[in-house]
Design a protein with these regions (language model features):
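Small-polar-interrupted transmembrane alpha-helices in polytopic inner-membrane proteins
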Residues: 2-22, 34-38
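Structural helix-adjacent loops and short alpha-helical linkers that scaffold large soluble proteins
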Residues: 2-3, 51, 55
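Structural motif marking the loop-to-transmembrane transition
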Residues: 3-7, 23-32, 59, 63-66
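Transmembrane beta-barrel domains of bacterial outer-membrane proteins
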Residues: 13, 80-333
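Alpha-helical transmembrane segments that form the membrane-embedded catalytic/substrate-binding core
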Residues: 20-49
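Short, amphipathic alpha-helical segments
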Residues: 34-37, 41, 60, 64, ...
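Flexible, glycine-rich linker and terminal segments associated
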Residues: 53-89, 102
């Protein structure tokens, strides 16, 4: 079960910290790899099960098996030894899975220098596992519903990446209004960003709600809000190295994610999202640190399976002493 596997993930993190590295064991690494291992491990387990159970042959089957090997090597190894009978121990049903691939050009600007861009290519995926607004009996176990976004930035001088994930631990469906649908529950969050001007990580658990309201015609309005505590997070700091030997500040805190999305006919959509993370510094240059970003994007369908979009991002960094305050902009197609 999910809860029965958590101690093994934490134990694996401890073993690596104490016996697999040359440096002294670090509490922040134990917490980060423990939380991250639980989240990423369960997501990989669920996704690989959906892939190998899919009915396809030829090149499609080869592609499914290759991706399943990438996201969950242990399942492939067990199938080689024990055969497909190990599949009977996987989750008994496969919920709907929506997978998107992204690619384009991303640019970042400094504050007060908006005309100076650093364009570079990026690729990414967006994954939604399960239906948050489906039948009442669909959500029986942790991670029966989760969302994952991963991005990779091809900057030659400073390549970057980001991961934003949240998975349902426990939830209940609600039905506000005449046709509204909602999911409220407890979610686990694993967020990480490392780009040209912005670096942070946060792991936590908290409450959240996701809603969907059909409008007239084919329009639909969606909203989500998550508030969660951060067990341990970190944010980059130019002034921490002289104090701690690290270029980031560490500490517990809190986080918030919000998004408002409106879908229109013909595959068009508009979205506005804002996330903010606050950290109380246990090790670093400032007593309190904050990191947040605002995103506005629009998309339009080109074909049934392809969309073209434009996104504007604003990154802001705050500290109580003002040492690490920063503001940057991003634009991507």
């Amino acid at each position: 079960s999910f809860w029965g596997s958590v101690p093994f993930t934490v134990f694996g993190s401890l073993v690596w910290e104490f016996f697999g590295e040359r440096e002294n064991a670090s509490l922040n690494d134990v917490i980060t790899t423990g939380f991250g291992g639980v989240a990423m491990g369960e997501m990989g387990h669920r996704l690989s099960a959906a892939l190998v159970r899919g009915r396809s042959d030829g090149a499609g089957r080869v592609a499914r098996e290759a991706v399943a090997l990438l996201v969950n090597p242990v399942l492939t190894f067990n199938r080689l030894i024990y055969g497909d009978r190990v599949l009977y121990r996987l989750p008994g049903r496969t919920p709907p899975v929506d997978l998107e691939f992204h690619s384009g050009i991303n640019g970042t600007w400094e504050r007060r220098a908006f005309t100076i861009a650093f364009p570079h290519p990026f690729i990414g995926i967006g994954l939604r596992y399960g239906d948050p607004f489906g039948a009442a009996g669909d959500l029986r176990a942790p991670y029966d519903y989760f969302r994952l976004r991963v991005g990779l930035y091809g900057d030659v001088d400073n390549p970057g990446s980001d991961v934003f994930a949240h998975g349902l631990l426990w939830g209940r469906r609600l039905y506000p209004g005449r046709e509204g649908r909602a999911l409220a529950g407890v979610f686990q969050h694993f967020d990480y960003m490392d780009n040209y001007k912005f670096k942070f990580a946060a792991n936590g658990v908290g409450g959240g709600i996701e809603t969907s309201f059909p409008l007239d015609g084919e329009r639909e309005l969606g909203f989500l809000l998550h508030l969660f505590g951060v067990a341990l997070g970190g944010v980059d700091s130019r002034y921490s190295r002289g104090l701690t030997g690290r270029d980031y500040s560490l500490g517990p805190g809190a986080g918030m994610k919000s998004e408002l999305r409106c879908s229109f006919p013909a595959g068009r959509s508009l979205a506005l999202a804002y996330s903010y993370y606050w950290f109380f510094t246990l090790s670093g240059s400032d007593r309190e640190n904050g990191a947040g970003f605002l995103s506005g994007q629009g998309e339009a369908a080109v074909t049934d399976t392809t969309r073209l979009g434009l996104e504007f991002r604003l990154y802001h960094r705050w500290s109580d002493a003002g040492f690490d305050d920063a503001l940057s902009f991003g634009l991507r197609t």
